[in-house]
Amino acid sequence: MPLAGPAAYAIAVYAEPDGTEGGSPYLLRPAQDRSFEGVACVDDAARAVVLYCLLWQRYGISTAWTAAQGLLRFLAYMQDEDGRFTNFILDWKGRKNLTGSTSYLGGPQWQARALHALAWGSSTFGGAEWHERFTRGLPWVCGVMPYLDVRAVCVLAALHHWQATGDASSAKRAITWAEDIAAARSGDILLNATSVQPIHLWGHLQETALAKTGRVLGRPEFVEIALASAEALLIPAADWCSTAPCVLPFEVSCIVSGLATVARSTEDPRYADAAARARAWFLGRNSAGSPVYDHGSGLVYDGIDQGRVSRNSGAESNIEGALALLCSTPQDSPVE
């Protein structure tokens, strides 16, 4: 990516089996679900920063340090002077997509994920740059946010920034945003958006956000709300994913994250056990009866479709699968 600079890394959005004799095992392909979007994006790079920072902090893997630094450089390139991020690059030269429906300056999903990644950059590498970029990008998520699943990412970003820097305003912001999430429920279930049903699990991190905020900042009522939603939504979902004909890795990752974080915040083994059941979806506890994580190749496939494993293998699936599988260790949910 010459336009992004020699140190920047990005991750191809999608890959699919070649299928031709003598061809490479996988071919990269762009995102074009809503017309042509691009070849790599901030959404995936930001998730991967969290993953690689975690691997470096927890295990000291040197290649993870290098990857996190390179992906942070890509995020820096994708941030405008006013603090907003655009999502996609159109090609491997690094030309930005500034006009797509899934790629424009300041889109809430990629703005929130980029801030989460910058908070992890601050905690992992220190220095002024990632803190400055976080501060510059923050105002763009401080307005009204109808998407409570995105707001959950904002909570995790603010909370991690506070843990990295001690900035009291970030802790205050995490509490305020957590209150917004806690106020939007249908019965005990935390909503993705006010009055929007049914609940989709893709990106559903509200239990994760509330359980961690409650534990770290001493707000037990947040833990209780997260526990109630986990009981009503996530524990049933841990078994739903074992039989459902169509399931995405990101759905399972969110189930695992919420249950693992509630388990840590309550010390109740029921939630850890449920997280383990959901995590087993990657290993063959699914309607296909076949692993979605291929241990031999290291790939996570793109999920179960009509009871069969899709052999496509995109960035989101691999990153979210890795985060879910890392939840099998005693530490906090990696998404935190």
Annotated model-derived regions:
Residues 89-94, 154-157, 195-199, 296-301:
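Short alpha-helical linear motifs
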Residues 1-3, 217-312, 329-336:
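Non-catalytic carbohydrate-binding regions of carbohydrate-active enzymes
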Residues 1-47, 51, 57-101, 124, ...:
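Low-complexity, Ser/Thr/Pro/Gly-enriched N-terminal "stalk/linker" regions
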Residues 140-146, 184, 188, 196:
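Helix-loop junctions that connect tandem helical modules in alpha-solenoid scaffolds
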Residues 98-104, 308-309:
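Short, P/G- and charge-enriched loop/turn segments at secondary-structure junctions
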Residues 39-56, 68, 106-122, 147-163, ...:
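Well-ordered alpha-helical segments within folded domains of soluble proteins
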Residues 1-35, 110, 116-121, 126-127, ...:
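Extended glycan-interaction surfaces of carbohydrate-active proteins
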Residues 49, 53, 65-79, 112-115, ...:
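Hydrophobic core segments within long, regular secondary-structure runs in both alpha-
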